[in-house]
């Protein structure tokens, strides 16, 4: 529902999430670089626009994308047409990825520094096809109910195996492209599709089965792009037409243009990113399902809010953070202390992740369907910590040298080990968190930092060493989120309904004791906390599974109940 209170709450949270970015920029600019940026006013205005745009974007998600995505999934599940679900999954994956802005940036950079071997359009097609294929695999897993870690571990083995065949120039790029395929708009819709299917199909759990599609969308491009690299480096000769790396980096973040044409061009770019999603939804809703969308007016308003909010969000970033972040990265490489570079990389990773719109949306959904067992703010902190560690470690690799494959293999080993330790409900969310963290805000800043470091440090190759930071930013959140799950499980954190659950044996003994001792209050320990219930009631209502009906009946009689009514 559209209401002012919801928007104001989202606005408050948006500016709270931007605070870490502001503090990081101010600290490094004033304390380390010791200069006041020339464009500080535009940066300030840009941050304000980012905050408002983020709030509008999130409101649009809640009103438009989440409801229609979950509704479509439910309709397909009720229809029982697996073929149409699979086709819909592929179209959503392919159609939303091919126009992804972050993918456009990385593909253009790769084409520019590969001596013409890599074609930007072909690379985008390869990645888009791999994401469509990934969503199909993820939907098939939900339908069949197979545990996600079987697929993920197999995927990791294939990724590592592919590195032994692909040229070293393509490995870092392939790992990075696994992180840029999930956009700010795609992530919520894909998550809604998975959660909607898992909520509708009998025997599926939305927490255990609903998440995971984003993880597949991050994994498969690494495999497909490496095989594409084998082809281009085997059969395509390098051309003499190549843009210098330093020039290419600068041109990816031009000074923001306030002209009407530039503003309209930016808005058109966002519309192009969102319209394919809307087109796919309308086609399947009206042509395949032959069913009108409920609350169509609200859904269209929601999509309009997503477009306006995302456009404002990007304008705000271009006005301040993009150019400032790249300038600071170049200034820091001239500093004698590598520790400052690592600290800046980690701080940028943490602050941009906390402001990532798609992470906020997914964290809210995780809290909702986990009955509050997963705290959305703490989940975001865990993800941001993982990104921070990953980017700092990635910067360390660029500065000191080293093969990215060894770092990635060790990271995968940690992920696999934690998969068998962490509670089941957190594993799909942890896998998804790796893809959620690298989209609108993070990718341009992190890519610029990596290529800037590789360009300015002697002995480094921008194509081999410059890419890879996004891969680190995608890998380590999986580790920190699983660790968060282990900690919450050890602490005995319960969901809202679990907190109120009363075990039958404890209820029976407590009521019997109260009756025999003439007590006015009954004490039940239940879930480790002492609950007190006033004995001023004529009936007790207990919710139990069907198989426990006889046990509940016996417990009530032993407690002295004069009658028992069972409602199923």
Regions found by a protein language model. Give the residues of each.
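Helix-loop-helix junctions within the multi-pass membrane cores of secondary transporters/permeases
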Residues: 82-159, 338-418
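Signature of multi-pass transmembrane helix bundles
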Residues: 1-59, 74-75, 79, 191, ...
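Hydrophobic alpha-helical transmembrane segments in multi-pass integral membrane proteins
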Residues: 165-171, 224-232, 313-320, 445-460
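Alpha-helical transmembrane segments
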Residues: 135, 139-146, 170-173, 195-209, ...
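Transmembrane alpha-helix boundary signature
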Residues: 34, 57-70, 96-106, 168-170, ...
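Positively charged, small/polar-rich N-terminal and surface patches that mediate targeting and assembly
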Residues: 508-568
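Structural signature of hydrophobic alpha-helical transmembrane segments
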Residues: 17-19, 48-55, 117-129, 176-190, ...
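Transmembrane helix-loop boundary segments of multi-pass membrane transporters
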Residues: 41-44, 60, 111-124, 140-157, ...
């Amino acid at each position: 529902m559209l209401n002012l209170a919801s928007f104001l709450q989202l606005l408050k949270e948006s500016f709270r999430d931007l605070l870490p970015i502001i503090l990081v920029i101010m600290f490094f600019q004033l304390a380390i670089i010791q200069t006041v940026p020339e464009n500080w006013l535009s940066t300030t205005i840009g941050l304000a626009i980012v905050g408002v745009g983020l709030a509008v974007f999130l409101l649009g998600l809640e009103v438009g994308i989440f409801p229609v995505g979950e509704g479509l999934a439910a309709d397909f599940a009720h229809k029982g047409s697996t073929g149409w679900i699979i086709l819909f999954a592929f179209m959503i994956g392919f159609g939303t990825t091919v126009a992804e802005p972050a993918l456009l940036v990385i593909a253009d950079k790769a084409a520019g520094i590969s001596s013409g071997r890599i074609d930007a359009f072909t690379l985008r097609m390869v990645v888009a096809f791999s994401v469509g294929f990934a969503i199909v695999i993820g939907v098939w897993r939900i339908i069949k109910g197979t545990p996600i870690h079987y697929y993920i571990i197999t995927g990791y083995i294939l990724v590592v195996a592919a590195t032994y065949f692909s040229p070293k120039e393509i490995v870092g790029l392939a790992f990075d492209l696994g992180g840029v395929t999930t956009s700010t708009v795609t992530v919520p819709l894909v998550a809604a599709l998975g959660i909607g299917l898992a909520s509708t199909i009998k025997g599926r759990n939305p927490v255990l089965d609903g998440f995971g599609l984003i993880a597949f969308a991050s994994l498969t491009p690494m495999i497909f792009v490496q095989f594409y690299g084998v082809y281009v480096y085997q059969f395509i000769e390098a051309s003499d037409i190549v843009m210098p790396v330093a020039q290419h980096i600068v041109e990816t973040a031009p000074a923001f243009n306030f002209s009407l044409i530039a503003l309209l061009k930016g808005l058109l770019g966002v519309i192009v990113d969102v319209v394919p999603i809307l087109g796919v939804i309308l086609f399947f809703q009206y042509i395949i399902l032959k069913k009108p969308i409920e609350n169509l007016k609200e859904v269209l308003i929601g999509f309009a809010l997503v477009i306006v909010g995302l456009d404002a969000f990007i304008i705000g970033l271009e006005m301040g953070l993009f150019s400032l972040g790249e300038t600071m990265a170049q200034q820091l490489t001239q500093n004698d202390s590598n520790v400052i570079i690592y600290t800046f990389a980690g701080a940028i990773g943490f602050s941009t992740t906390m402001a990532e719109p798609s992470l906020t949306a997914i964290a809210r959904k995780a809290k909702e369907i986990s009955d509050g067992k997963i705290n959305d703010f703490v989940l975001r902190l865990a993800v941001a910590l993982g990104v921070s560690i990953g980017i700092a470690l990635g910067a360390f690799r660029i500065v000191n040298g080293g093969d990215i494959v060894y770092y990635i293999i060790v990271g995968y080993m940690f992920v696999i080990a934690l998969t068998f330790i962490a509670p089941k409900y957190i594993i799909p969310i942890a896998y998804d968190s790796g893809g959620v963290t690298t989209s609108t805000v993070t990718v341009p800043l992190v890519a610029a930092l990596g290529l800037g470091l590789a360009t300015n440090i002697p002995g480094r190759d921008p194509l081999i060493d410059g890419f890879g930071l996004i891969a680190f930013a995608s890998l380590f959140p999986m580790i920190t989120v699983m660790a968060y799950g282990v900690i919450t499980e050890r602490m005995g954190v319960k969901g809202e309904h679990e907190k109120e659950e009363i075990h039958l044996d404890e209820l029976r003994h407590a009521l019997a004791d109260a009756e025999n001792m003439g007590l006015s209050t009954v004490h039940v320990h239940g879930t480790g906390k002492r609950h007190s219930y006033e004995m001023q009631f004529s009936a007790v209502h207990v919710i139990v599974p069907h198989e426990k009906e006889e046990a509940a009946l016996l417990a009530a009689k032993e407690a002295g109940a004069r009658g028992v009514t069972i409602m199923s």
